[in-house]
Every structure is written in C-alpha cells, then in structure tokens.
A protein has these predicted regions:
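Structural motif
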Residues: 55-57
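Short, small/polar residue-rich loop motifs at catalytic or cofactor-binding pockets
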Residues: 262-263
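Conserved functional hotspot residues or short segments at active or partner-binding sites
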Residues: 271-310
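PDZ/PDZ-like peptide-tail recognition elements
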Residues: 2-40
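A generic structural motif
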Residues: 30, 91-95, 269
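Cleft-lining beta-strand/loop regions that shape enzyme active-site pockets
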Residues: 12, 37-40, 46-53, 62-65, ...
Length: 310
C-alpha cells in the first residue's frame, strides 16, 4: 500500500508542494471513488478564507462537473489552479447540510509554510502548529521555538492536527528537540526483516518540558512518528482523535522519462514496537472507506457542537 506512480505532468506540482508558494485555490484533496474530497484548506489560502472545510466534496468547478468523471489528480489540479485573481465557482457537498453550497474562490498565492502559528498561550506555555514536514520545516520550527523560549516558554503545545506528513528525516529532527541524546525515536523493518534504529543525537531545547501533542484523523505518517516517539518515551501527552494510521516508509525514484515512482520499502515502529499502520487486508476501498467515515463523523460532530453553541 501507498506505493504510487507519479506521471511527468504531475511530478513538478508534487515537488512544488513541498517547497515554495503557488497560485491556486489552496486545498489538499483525496481523489477517491469519483469524488474529490478536501483533506484541508491550506491556512492563509483562498479556500481557507472562504470557509472550505475538511470533508467537503467538490462536485463542480464553474460549469464543469468533477464528481463522477474519473479525473486524474493532474487534471483536477489543472482545473482548480489558474491565473492570480481569477475566479472559480465551486459547488460543494458538505456532510450534515442538506443543500449544496456554492463558494466563489479568487485564486491567489497559497503560502506553503510549515509552521503556520506560533505564540504564547500563557507566561510559560508556548504553542506551535506544524501543517507538514517539508524541506524548510525544521528551520521554521527552530526559529519559532527560539522566539518562544525568549518569551519564557518552558512547556509546549505541538499541534499536528491535519498534518498529513512529509519527510521522515524532518520528523526525526523535530522529535530530537524533545528527547535526550541516545533515546530511540523509531525503528524501521523491511521485507527481509532488516532493522534500522533511529536515535536522538542532539541536545534538545525542550527535553525537560511538558509537551502536549494535538492530533486528529488527518495526522499521518511523519506526524504519527513524532507523536509516537514522544508518547512511548513518556515525553508527551497525546490529545485529540485517533490518527490516520500510515506507518509505511516510501522511497521516491526518478525515472528517465521525467516521471517517478514511490515504493513502499519498509514499515516503521514506535519505540515500544507499535506499528501505526492500519490494516490493509480488506484492500484499498475498505482502507479509505474507514477514513471517509471518520471524516463524516467529524463533520457531524462539528455541526452538532455548533448547534449546541448557538
């Protein structure tokens, strides 16, 4: 599972998403069962500002029907992206809402920052939200915690909700900030049962801190590595919903025609030997059905909470 082929026309946008800004509507999505389902609206982007929510299903873009068309990811991206300040009308199906919703999105620069929030909650408790583990994430994180430490932070809330993962090495660097030298962060095991152990190596700036890690059903892969390492080493309290359950390691290999493949090469385990990977025994459909059902329950729970709050 999670092995994939990336066509040449998709590869540039995939790599772009792990680097700089781009012009578009600013959503991460799953293309499954003829349905384009929003994982998250990127904070600071046009869809986030317009009120698009996780679990929303995009049915139409202007007069183009997207639902049921078997569009590839690259075609969806091509349709949703466009020139700066151009408009696109999205028709959305939202769980818990009977009627369809229309949103006018003005395409603009989508900020792809990893650390999207960093501030003091009280005189000793800092807060950092990381939305992905990309090339620049650790440098952004370092800068944020240096600022928090200068403001008096001795404890930290690490928000990994809706963080779908990224580079394993970056997750290891983040976890290292909370763990003492020589502490096991994770280990991987491949098909031949070869084991590779990853240990903390540097002096972490929050080794003595109380750490609270926020997760939800969209916290996956690298997010689960960090959360699992802190939990198993009794360095962090996990708060939130059950995470996605992706405990596999992929390696990307570029091909001669400009495309690439990502192959699952090993399974990772938390320090106590737990595998985060959800069962794939019933196949891809059941695997993702479980995820979508959880998204729908989340949307209903949110709607009910909003009604109670009113």
């Amino acid at each position: 599972p999670h092995s994939s082929y990336i066509p040449k026309q998709d590869l540039a946008s995939v790599k772009e998403n792990m680097k700089g800004d781009f012009i578009g509507i600013g959503v991460s999505f799953y293309n499954y069962k003829d349905s384009i389902t929003v994982i998250r609206a990127i904070e600071g982007g046009p869809s986030f500002r317009a009120g698009i929510l996780p679990g929303d299903r995009i049915l139409m873009a202007d007069d183009d029907t997207i639902y049921g068309q078997n569009w590839s990811d690259s075609k969806v991206i091509e349709r949703l992206r466009g020139k700066k300040n151009s408009k696109v009308q999205l028709t959305i199906k939202r769980t818990g809402v009977d009627s369809l919703l229309d949103f006018e999105i003005i395409r603009s620069e989508v900020p792809i920052k990893s650390v999207v929030a960093s501030y003091m909650i009280n005189p000793t408790l800092g807060y950092v939200k990381i939305n992905r583990f990309a090339e620049s994430t650790f440098l952004e994180f370092e800068k944020s915690i240096e600022n928090l430490l200068s403001e008096g932070a001795s404890n930290l809330v690490l928000d990994l909700r809706d963080n779908s993962g990224g580079f394993l090495q970056i997750a290891e660097q983040i976890a290292d900030e909370f763990l003492e030298d020589g502490t096991l962060i994770l280990f991987t095991k491949n098909k031949t049962n070869e084991i590779e152990k990853i240990f903390a190596t540097a002096k972490g700036r929050f080794e003595k801190a109380e750490v609270y890690v926020l997760i939800n059903e969209n916290s996956a892969s690298a997010s689960e590595i960090v959360a699992g390492a802190l939990q198993d080493n009794d360095k962090g309290i996990i708060i939130g919903r059950r995470s996605f359950g992706k405990g596999l390691v992929q390696q990307e290999m570029d091909l001669g025609d400009g495309s690439a493949i990502r192959l699952t090469t090993s399974r990772y385990y938390t320090p106590t030997g737990r595998s985060i990977q959800r069962s794939y025994d019933k196949g891809s459909e059941a695997y993702y059905d479980d995820y979508y059902q959880r998204l729908e329950h989340r949307a209903v729970d949110t709607l009910q909470s909003d009604l109670l709050a009113d």
